[in-house]
Amino acid sequence: MKPQPTQPAASQRLLSLDALRGFDMLFIMGFATLVVNVCHIFPGDVSAAVAESMSHPAWHGFSHHDTIFPLFLFIAGISYPFSLAKQRSLGATQGDLYRKILKRGALLILFGLIYNGLFRLDWPMRTASVLGRIGLAWALAAMLFLNFRTRTRIGIVGAILVGYWSLLALVPAPDAPAGADVYSMEGTIVGYIDRLLLPGKLHNKIFDPEGLLSTVPAVATAMLGMLTGEFVRLSEQRLSGNRKALYIALAAVAFTLVGILWDLSFPINKKLWTSSFVCVVAGYSLGMFALFYWIIDVKGYKGWVLPFQVIGLNSITIYMAQRIVDFKGISAFFFGGLAAKMPEALAPVVASTGYLLVSWLFLYFLYKKRIFLKV
């Protein structure tokens, strides 16, 4: 049977987004560990490089693991124009839209605090979090998207990226050690703002990778996703799905090149969320979305999507569950005996495969029961 393309209506959910979100989250639910363990079986330069890409660089630099967080935020951005169109079609007022944005942002911040151990009552606790940054960056971007037209939104993204670069380059931390580089952990104004204003513990004592000032360029990441979603919503009469995918792919190349060139003066750094990092991960995110969108929504090849869709529809659930549910213990109960009988090199592969399978089956159970955590 020939695959059927399904161009989305103005407010329809994109299946490619659920699949891409699931692919992204797959790496934090055990797949990255599995890749590393498989690479250890086949020693060599290529395997070593692949394994290294499954972890974050110490400071400057870029790896695949650096793409997971910003891709999720970018996808949240793509979704918003579709959600906004649906809300407006149901008669939502401007006040309703503001309340929904604030509610979602606040819930994500709350989930971030819970993830960090809110209920342990161990004070002071770390208040910055991945979910908290998503909540703040997405909510601020949504407010801007709601109140400005496309050209102004693009201008805001440019102003954020150039302004952030200028600030970090020209304003070092007042308490920086003598000779400290303005882009170092000790010398950057980003860490100083965290030490001055961010309540609770900092992740690295003097710096937090999900701190306050570095959330500002993350707003640009979310906004770029929203601009992409707005572009995809253009009617088929104005622009075909094939052309949309092509233009998004070309934009991916352009952003990647800009990021690589910008790295010469403003290093690519996830922890600082530098403007060059924003551009490079925008390139990656646009490229991955173009691929998934073209295959799934334009060409209609959907038979392979379910494993990723199961994850993508409950992405916040699995993120929180990794912290709350003892998947490692459950996996050891079912797969520990088999892993123990494997050769030494294969045992970690069996264990990590079991962990990934248990995590996925948990989500599949929720999927079959139609239980989804919606924020």
Pin down the residues of each PLM region.
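Alpha-helical transmembrane segments and their immediate juxtamembrane cytosolic regions
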Residues: M1-V375
